[in-house]
Amino acid sequence: VLLIMVGTVFAVGPAGLIVTLCKNSGMSGLLTTTLFWLIIILVYYFIATFISIDAIIGKIYPVFGICLIIMAVGVIFGIFTNPAYTIPEIWANFSNMHPSNTPIWSFMFITVACGAISGFHSTQSPLMARCMKSEKQGHFVFYGAMVCEGVIALIWAAAGCALYTITDGKMAGLAEALAAGQSAAIYDVCAKTMGGVGIALAMIGVVICPVTSGDTAFRSARLTLADWLKIDQDSYANRLKLCIPVLGVGAFLGIGNAMGFINYTVIWRYFSWTNQTLAMIVLWAASMYLFKEKKNYWITAVPATFMSAVSCTYFVLAPECLGKMINTYADGKLVAYNTAVAYPIGIIFAIAMLALFIHATKKHTASQKA
């Protein structure tokens, strides 16, 4: 489910940005329709999902990664060198700046998704492990990549705070920019901080990089299903049997958004929650593995406990999950989040998961002594 969600959001987002780039370049007609570009991306996804990882993207992926890093550096450099932009001092603005007063806990941790911790990245472990020469490279590749992505997320957060108007302590300017869509906001930030060069980098960094993540997601979904169903993937016919349903679901969600009957922000939130929940599960699994290997398991057990609280709290509070049952609505609109119920449930769930883990470790230790 997560992998298909990843593929979907990384098809719809780039398609929207391409449309923005085309419109701002003076184009019109078919080239300025999201559906057109979405279909092109989905066709590419089908080809990339069908063939091996090294057939298309394996050799040029590092180039796109470098472009993404250069774009992030360019954004922060553009902020620091322009006296009109000032990043708000963190302690003076240590408050909820969301115009709609959406709770920071745990919406912020779900929204940032891959910028903090990513279950999706863990699904790529089997593929990436085959690309490394030794286990020691795992620290640099996996941990290093997540730290790098976290820095990029912080840069974009800083850009959102520095470039847009803050009214009465709320990020009203950023909310207005995002009202035109995430693609328009990305285009605006790159244009303001880097000019024409920024727009070109946005094309590479925010269009091509997500697309390459999307094709990886769909390919991984195919391989995961193949493992579950014991379907050999050497045969092109067997690959096709899995490619069609996997891409079919992604196409339904993506085209549904392009045609206006599926909300992209809802797809993104479901992806984000699924992503962080998988991260929680993997952290608990890693904790038990480290315990059995007689290594320091607290380095994963502590973040696993934290992510348990994050995932559970969001599931209870979010309108697209259980929020409609406990939050306050007026005339069909959300007016208040019931944090008094959601926060304790999230904390209790996290404590219960930690207690279950500790019980499992003691049970394993006792069985080893017997």
What are the residue ranges of the model-derived segments?
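Select transmembrane alpha-helical segments in multipass membrane proteins
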Residues: 1-2, 37-40, 98-113, 154, ...
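Extracellular/periplasmic helix-exit of transmembrane alpha-helices
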Residues: 76-92, 145-188, 255-262
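Helix-loop-helix module between adjacent transmembrane segments
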Residues: 1-49, 113-117, 205-215, 234
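Membrane-embedded alpha-helical segments of transport systems
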Residues: 1-8, 144-156, 245, 275
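Transmembrane helix-bundle signature of multi-pass membrane transporters/permeases
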Residues: 112-115, 142-150, 206-209, 304-307
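Helix-loop-helix connectors at the membrane interface of multi-pass transporters/channels
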Residues: 12-36, 127-150, 185-188, 214-242
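A generic transmembrane alpha-helix motif of multi-pass inner-membrane proteins
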Residues: 48, 58, 67, 74-84, ...
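Helix-loop-helix junctions that connect adjacent transmembrane helices in secondary transporters/permeases
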Residues: 159-204, 213, 217, 228-234
